[in-house]
Curated annotation (Swiss-Prot):
Misc remark: Bacitracin is thought to be involved in the inhibition of peptidoglycan synthesis by sequestering undecaprenyl diphosphate, thereby reducing the pool of lipid carrier available.
Membrane topology: Multi-pass membrane protein
Catalytic reaction annotation: di-trans,octa-cis-undecaprenyl diphosphate + H2O = di-trans,octa-cis-undecaprenyl phosphate + phosphate + H(+)
Gene this protein is translated from: uppP
EC number: 3.6.1.27
Keywords: Antibiotic resistance, Cell inner membrane, Cell membrane, Cell shape, Cell wall biogenesis/degradation, Hydrolase, Membrane, Peptidoglycan synthesis, Transmembrane, Transmembrane helix
Family that this chain belongs to: Belongs to the UppP family.
Segments passing through the bilayer: 43-63, 85-105, 109-129, 183-203, 218-238, 254-274
A single cellular component GO annotation: plasma membrane
Protein name: Undecaprenyl-diphosphatase
Amino acid sequence: MDLWTAAQALILGVVEGLTEFLPISSTGHQIIVADLIDFGGERAMAFNIIIQLGAILAVVWEFRRKILDVVVGLPKQQQAQRFTLNLLIAFMPAVVLGVIFADTIHHYLFNAITVATALVIGGVIMLWAERREHTVRTETVDDMSWSDALKIGLVQCLAMIPGTSRSGSTIIGGLLFGLSRKAATEFSFFLAMPTMVGAAVYSGYKYRDMFRPDDFAVFAIGFVTSFIFAMIAVRGLLKFIATHSYAVFAWYRIAFGLLILATWQFGWIDWASAKA
């Protein structure tokens, strides 16, 4: 492993960790940054799976007490049973639609222009959602109904389009469906666990021949970096949303998306053929 390869792994690990749980699209940022630093091919597919697992481990660690309470209480506690059922209900739409459409979406939509367009549109929707008057019906994740979970699960499927943002769609969807800001954000984190682990297992099996022993060091750098920066991002976001709205992320999405479109329109960078 040369120094540049290590630097690429470090950069992409930081990008994944910082963006996975913020409503700004980690996939979109990975596509853009990977193209800029020329990190692609079979190694990139396997590498992306590894760094996503690093990010997920950060959320598992951050919410380990809640997870342990649910596991211990599952046999007897109705609250734990309802929470688990809601997660399963919210998870299933992504499973069904992911199996059906994942390859087609990856082939046709995983490019920088799609990412930029989705960033802008998602940012506008986020601003609109934040400026609406919210009527909070559900204060905590334990108070959610199965219909809330199903609606959030369906909204999560929009994130199959790169640039949309899984966390952005589920958080904003949760707010529109009457969840408090804290409940919408936390449920988005919990829903990420089965969704991302499921996607990683599916992709890992599909691309199992691309995992090679000589790439271990590259994967390790990406995994550890992603874990550390995802932990920072999760803790930072939970503190931030206690006193702020998501408007700053919406404006960032719009500005970043327009910048990408401008560089393409004026011919400064040829994004048209950029692929994940």
